[in-house]
Design a protein with these regions (language model features):
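N-terminal plug
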Residues: 49-136, 144, 152, 157, ...
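Outer-membrane beta-barrel translocator/receptor signature
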Residues: 172-176, 184-187, 198-209, 215-277, ...
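Transmembrane beta-strands of outer-membrane beta-barrel pores
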Residues: 226-230, 247, 263-267, 374-378, ...
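C-terminal beta-signal and adjacent terminal beta-strands/loops
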Residues: 771, 824-829, 851-907
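Gram-negative outer-membrane beta-barrel transporters
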Residues: 599, 703-832
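Non-catalytic regulatory/gating segments with a bias toward low-complexity or hydrophobic composition
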Residues: 105, 117, 189, 209-211, ...
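Surface-exposed, low-complexity loop segments enriched in small/polar and acidic residues
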Residues: 170, 275-282, 311-349, 355, ...
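Short loop/turn motifs that connect adjacent beta-strands in outer-membrane beta-barrel proteins
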Residues: 216-219, 250-255, 362-366, 453-463, ...
Length: 907
């Protein structure tokens, strides 16, 4: 009730703002034309916006405007802003841009870029980190603005597009791995919380994240840190070291070279390292079951019978309380084995990243640049043990000739000496060795270009051109997979003692084998832009105009390797994708002052895709600043999203999904559809920012996003069943254009500084509330996924809390700084399990302290999750097959209380 009341209050604030805007605008339109700018008196002050950007071709290079010589009148300097072609001096533009500094990242306690961005309020739901179990994109992390999943958010590096991670998150979402960049190379991050298709193209529907790196650095800087979990279990020790250096002054030497490199290692941790998961027992939780891996005989009466002697490390437990067994039997008992060490919560990770940037001044108005980024990331995660005969996910064998899957025969014949019944009997059995996935991910990008400016009588024009190539290559190596032939020999010929494997030491010879798959993603880009904020002068201000053109070639290939493609192993990780496309685009932006303080902006982009055709995406925006302390803005966008290669190529993906009706898992093969149409999108944003004093900023925005022709899983084309038992083996599901997705919500920001005799106190907040996330699918009424876990049933989805927010209290006194951060995630309704009916909210407090009193040194340290909070329990994520954490891993990460200490030395 409190949340509904607050949401109602926020809506009323929005309506009040609109009324205020109208009240101020009407007399403004009625007044006479203002005097020309050159008759103004006095001196204006320089105002640098929070969203000053870097220098890509798609966001042209900025040379601050110089004085015009109009007496003593100094011109406001204009800077680049992510989301705009035209330089601006305005602190707040036509949409909300959140700027994150390196200090903000450090104060949050985050160890990596991904850790920080995934905690921002705009990343509300449906995004996945490196800890997701059974994910093709293991070790990688993305961001999903406004809950639209990762394929709707565009991530740029220095304003330029980059190749996505070679595998798809959740097997469907294309995304850029946030772990690619060295943390010490980042200058700031700009987050455009609005649709930006009219400038950036297809995948900027929910917004843009522009990661801007350090340029023109001089000197040498070393930094390092250590971290470790303190309570809640063991594991997750982290080590980080970085070096940043640069030489040359761009103004005096006419060149600068800046280089950064970093090494990061996390030891990761498993279920065995956390108090809440080490026993694999959720029977004390509402609707909870035991997650011990079972071994049992399937009796003719539908009950389970444990082996005549449980394997070493196992003990007898009721079948009805076992998550896996209870899905296939009606009673009895099983041998349960604790396999907590076999499933990782976070993988063991090593990352080595490096970046080199060079600028060369050709003349006072022209600069050439070159940039090279390379990243090598290795992650190792345990993917659990093989439970052959698992009733939740049938054991399948792939036939490379027919390209079909068939059931593995789990019936132990009467002739097998280890069958005690004398009749053919099905056996569900846990093989003890954990499947380990080792991921080798290499990313590199090379770009070069030239940018500059020239003067015409009416003003200065900025221009830029660039060309770049980026590539992601990812190899997944799997060990301890089960060889189908050797497994069949064990079941049929009695070479393996199920109760006492040590008694048959040669029984498992050839059973454990390896397999792999490979993916390569490439992107070639050519950009050119031309823009001026001073096309000509009107009584109300300057008219701005910008043009851009872009050509890209995209390609993606995924191939199952040995072990999977040849049918050697059971339950193969199959995902095949082979696609490429050319995209040509032209775009523009026109800013026109209507009256003083009221500006209209119109922009548009035409894209032509070689596989799905062309689309025009317009944007219309207004910005009104009646007084210097208040800025109001609104924008309306129409856009589109082209299908990803996994959606519109002849792809096939074997996976496990959650049944909407029962909450149970089932196996599926999702098939690409070359006949898919592009999704069509509409965005509406209305917001304001008020700064009544130099130390106060308050912002609020309401947004609405509509996506038509939503691409999702269509009706099953076929269902394959076991002819012997009638059990569903898997379901073939094609991608299709379905109904619509409609979401709306609020985002608010606050920053208040208070200078006192004992230092400067700053309170800042970043909060989001999702009012609605409706999915309108054929054949049924729309379903609102906000505030519940319905979207888990979609291929991209996770649970969707309505509320998410961060609040930080920072205290700075002389050389000392302390920041206390409260991270909040709201509750959500439990729709897919009978109990509990509600999953509770979650609060985490982090404390970071920094001291700069020693010459050249910055010493810092802190504690994350001070009170060692455990994420709220959700039985959907304690089901024995997909996840065993007991919480939604797309929303939370349970590291426990975590301490870190580090230092930076500047020469």
């Amino acid at each position: 009730m409190k949340q509904r009341a607050l949401a109602l209050a926020i809506k009323r604030i929005i309506w009040a703002e609109l009324a205020l805007s109208a009240a101020i605008a009407i007399p403004a339109f009625a007044q006479s034309q203002p005097a020309a700018a050159d008759t103004a008196a006095g001196t204006t002050t320089e105002s640098k916006p929070a969203a000053a950007a870097a220098a890509p071709a798609s966001s042209t290079a900025a040379t601050p405007a110089t004085a015009t010589g109009n007496g003593n009148v100094a011109q406001l300097k204009k800077f680049e802003v992510t989301g705009s072609l035209i330089r601006s001096a305005d602190k707040v533009g036509f949409n909300q841009v959140q700027t994150v500094s390196q200090k903000d990242i450090q104060n949050s306690g985050a160890s990596t870029v991904a850790d920080f961005l995934r905690t921002t309020s705009a990343n509300s739901a449906n995004s996945w980190g490196e800890g997701q179990s059974a994910n093709f994109a293991a070790g990688a992390a993305g961001i999903a603005l406004r809950g639209l999943s990762e394929k709707y958010t565009l991530v740029l590096v220095d304003g330029q597009r980059v190749a996505p991670f070679a595998f798809f998150s959740n097997s469907v979402d294309s995304f850029f791995d946030l772990n690619t960049l060295p943390l010490n190379s980042i200058d700031r991050i700009e987050i455009v919380k609005a649709g930006a298709v009219s400038q950036y193209g297809s995948d900027a529907v929910a917004g843009v994240v522009n990661i801007i790196t350090k340029h023109d650095f001089q000197g040498l800087q070393l930094d390092g840190s250590l971290g470790s979990a303190l309570t809640g279990g063991n594991g997750d020790g982290t080590y980080k070291f970085g070096v940043l250096g640069g030489f040359g002054d761009l103004n005096s030497d006419r060149f600068n070279v800046t280089a950064a490199a970093s090494y990061y290692k996390s030891n990761g941790f498993t279920l065995a390292d956390r108090d809440s998961t080490r026993n694999q027992d959720f029977t004390q939780q509402p609707g909870g079951l035991s997650l011990l891996s079972p071994s049992y005989w399937n009796m003719p009466d539908g009950t389970a019978q444990p082996l005549m002697g449980c394997p070493p490390g196992s003990s007898v437990h009721p079948a009805g309380t076992n998550s896996i067994a209870s899905a296939g039997v009606t009673g009895g008992a099983v041998c349960g084995t604790n396999t907590a060490e076999s499933l990782s919560i976070l993988p063991l990770t090593e990352r080595l990243n490096a970046k080199l940037h060079a600028d060369f001044k050709v003349n006072d108005a022209t600069t050439a640049f070159g940039d090279f980024l390379i990243s090598s990331n290795t992650s190792t995660s345990n993917q659990g043990v093989n439970v052959v005969g698992n009733p939740q996910t049938p054991t399948l064998v792939y036939n490379p000739q027919t390209k079909q899957l068939s059931p593995f025969n789990t019936v132990v014949p009467a002739s097998n000496q280890y069958n005690p019944f004398g009749v053919d009997t099905p056996l569900t059995y846990t093989f003890p060795n954990a499947v380990a996935e080792e991921t080798y991910a290499t990313f590199w990008r090379a770009s070069t270009g030239i940018k500059g400016s020239f003067n015409l009588p009416n003003g200065e024009w900025d221009w830029a051109t660039s060309v770049s190539h980026s590539q992601s290559t990812v190899s997944n190596e799997y060990s301890n997979e089960l060889n189908a032939g050797a497994l069949n020999n064990i079941y049929q010929n009695g070479t393996y003692n199920f109760s006492n494997p040590a008694a048959t030491p040669n029984g498992s010879v050839g059973l454990y084998t390896s397999a792999n798959n490979l993916a390569i993603s490439k992107l070639d880009t050519v950009d050119a832009t031309l823009a001026t904020p001073e096309l000509f002068h009107l009584p109300a201000g300057d008219v701005g105009l910008g043009f851009g053109a872009q050509f890209t070639h995209q390609s993606e290939i995924m191939t199952p390797g040995g072990g999977f493609a040849d049918g050697t192993v059971i339950n193969p990780n199959l995902q095949t994708v082979n696609g490429q496309r050319n995209v040509a685009a032209v775009y523009y932006q026109l800013d026109i002052p209507i009256i003083r303080n009221l500006t209209f902006s119109q922009s548009g982009r035409y894209d032509h895709y070689s596989d799905v055709g062309g689309a025009f995406s317009p944007r219309f925006a207004l910005r009104y600043q009646p007084v210097s302390a208040l800025t109001m803005y609104t924008s309306y966008n129409r856009g589109f999203r082209a299908p990803t290669f996994v959606e519109d190529s002849n792809s096939r993906t074997l996976g496990i999904q959650v049944d909407q009706a029962t909450g149970q898992n089932y196996t599926s093969i999702t098939e690409g559809n070359p006949d898919l149409k592009a999704e069509r999108t509409r965005n509406l944003d209305i917001g304001f920012q008020v700064s009544p004093t130099r130390t106060t900023d308050v912002g609020l925005e309401w947004y609405k996003i509509r996506v038509d022709n939503v691409i999702g899983q269509g009706a099953p084309s076929s269902t394959v069943v076991d002819p012997t038992t009638g059990q569903t083996l898997y379901v073939n599901i094609p991608y299709a254009n379905l109904g619509y997705l409609d979401t709306n919500g609020f985002e608010g920001t606050l920053r208040q500084s208070l200078p006192t005799a004992v230092g400067m106190f700053t309170l800042s907040g970043d909060w989001a509330y999702v009012n609605s996330f409706k999915l309108g699918l054929p054949g049924g009424a729309p379903v609102n996924g906000a505030g519940n876990n319905y979207t888990i049933t979609q291929p991209f989805g996770g649970s969707f809390p309505r509320w998410k927010g961060n609040t930080t209290l920072d205290w700075n006194y002389h050389k000392f700084d302390a920041a206390l951060t409260w991270q909040f995630t709201g509750p959500y309704a439990q729709n897919l399990a009978s109990q509990p009916s509600r999953v509770g909210s979650y609060s985490q407090f982090n404390l970071m302290m920094t001291y700069t009193g020693f010459k050249h040194w910055t010493i810092y340290g802190g504690i994350d999750n001070i009170f060692n909070r455990i994420p709220p329990y959700d039985p959907i994520f304690a089901n024995g097959t997909l996840d065993q954490t007991g919480y939604d891993t797309s929303v939370y990460t349970y590291i426990g209380r975590f301490a870190q200490v580090g230092a930076t030395y500047k020469f």
